[in-house]
Amino acid sequence: MARQRRSITDIICENCKYLPTKRSRNKRKPIPKESDVKTFNYTAHLWDIRWLRHRARK
């Protein structure tokens, strides 16, 4: 069964449903507390690989 192509008007109307209001776009976000910020160590995997390579050589 072939999928019916959506009209441009239908796509535009669909996008307009989720547009934020001016107020919500300009509203300042509160700065989170230090305890609320979750960090992620992006280099952990690279360090693991390096450590395993170093260990394998010994």
Curated annotation (Swiss-Prot):
Pfam families reported for this sequence: NinE
InterPro entries linked: NINE
Family: Belongs to the ninE family.
Descriptive protein name: Protein ninE
